Amino acid sequence: MNAIQESFTDKLFANYEANVKYQAIENAASHNGIFAALERRQSHVDNTPVFSLDLTKDKVTNQKASGRCWMFAALNTFRHKLISQYKLENFELSQAHTFFWDKYEKSNWFLEQVIATADQELTSRKVKFLLQTPQQDGGQWDMVVSLFEKYGVVPKSVYPESVSSSSSRELNAILNKLLRQDAQILRDLLASGADHATVQDKKEDLLQEIFNFLAMSLGLPPRKFDFAYRDKDDNYQSEKGITPQEFYKKYVNLPLEDYVSVINAPTADKPYGKSYTVEMLGNVVGSRAVRYINVPMERLKELAIAQMQAGETVWFGSDVGQLSNRKAGILATDVYDFESSMDIQLTQDKAGRLDYSESLMTHAMVLTGVDLDENGKAKKVKVTLGNADAENQEILSGLKK
């Protein structure tokens, strides 16, 4: 290994001080911040909030201090349909309801994984992975569909937010503490030679404790409820004693079994046209597996545009923290000028960014509009970002590589 020599550092000083541009950027960046100093004026011109296809102007929902973006995005795709079809105003589906059942199901998923790996040492890679984070807020499209199909959905007015659904840190800390303790109980029971029935009986006792904790923290979910509303024409509508599953089938009524997650992962280990999954990722035991179909980016764009042209908003995920100006509402790879300002060359392609851990999907959102050119190609898309950090605004996404 070669250490940095003082003579080399002297050379770097000399090169920097000889460049007047660097000193100007130093003044701007040190006083205003790096991104503010490098922001491209043209990015605002290229991303004006006008779209040739704009599906919704509904008020944006806010996930607050929780990791429920995937739930919010999925429920917002239904919400647009319901508001349009039933002439509703300021209507939301309950994100807290889906959150409750996700925590319940993830707890069972974790305990079943603990049972399945009980013959492995605590130091094994899989067991360490399980115990590191027994459960957390995040999820995928297939996971939220599994929850909808099993537990249905309810209006937010029926099961509103709680402190622990809007800010989930305390709940997650306590639930993970319980689950790690439960993992030890089940592993010790299996190590003592207990049979399958005894282990499952104990697991059910542990799930009762977890259910009680969730109900006391979030509120007990409704088994049946009354649904009453006034539409935009001020007509009164009501329905008595409907279950969450009945509400889902009657009012949402989408063939979600026909929807799949399509991704663009141009890495050598993931050929296009094939289906992929992630081991030990899920929530509802026995439900649909998390699955992705890998396609070229142009095909992904075509599918998203076609779905919006058919009148449906699109659930999607991206690396939302990369190269964005949230205050301006712009998410685009050319929003900041690193090259001509700082002489920094950001040339790593998407495959390289994925392979070298520079990028991954971090946030789920909804595509709600698109601006097409004369050839039907997307110039920019409209994105609904249900996130408190972005001041609950809609952002724009430039469709560049």
Protein language model annotation of sequence segments:
Residues 1-63, 71-359, 371-373, 385-401:
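Structured alpha-helical subdomains that flank or immediately precede key functional sites
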Residues 363-365:
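Short beta-strand or tight-loop elements
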Residues 67:
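Catalytic cores of glycan-processing enzymes that make or break glycosidic bonds
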Residues 377-382:
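Short aromatic-glycine-enriched beta-strand elements
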